[in-house]
């Protein structure tokens, strides 16, 4: 199945969608305004973190020794419903998609692709897939996603599966910063190693762990812009930015396609 419109995959990190009380409805509402505008031209798939943080907010009295998988079990439905509620206000239908490495890397990836494209091509104005790594059921696979790049890698894989025109990784930074704290506007073969080194140094200096830091975002974005038969653009930008401006390369850091 081929999508009738170009696909955009937008990934929101946990810090962009949650606060101390769980999913942040006010910010989600603003993001959904952006999604509504974007859908006038593109088919949109969302990758959203936040299940674990939401579970912890819902169960504040639980021991710190409680496994993250348990918090994800508590929070995953609530996180999706928060998105669904705000999208429904825009008369946009949405559906939850929980994914593991197995479904992406095995032949089942084709099934996942067809299912997501079927949702986006639904005759009644499409359904927006809201994907998340299945932290509850996946052991080795989902844990690998979390330790390495959180949902960044998942978003990159989904963008490749769907043949997306754009992959947008949204964060709390204006883009990838150089040593002078200026946004690096474009990353390609000529400067990717230097950009990776800068992102790694900053992540270590600021105490960032191994989950979804800027280094991993740069790696995922660069790989995504080189992946597939029809590589697409990848972008890293601040979640508060206008998505149209990000896709038009007016704000953030951008990775041009190169087969």
Where are these regions (language model features)?
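C-terminal catalytic "cap/lid" subdomain
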Residues: 1-259
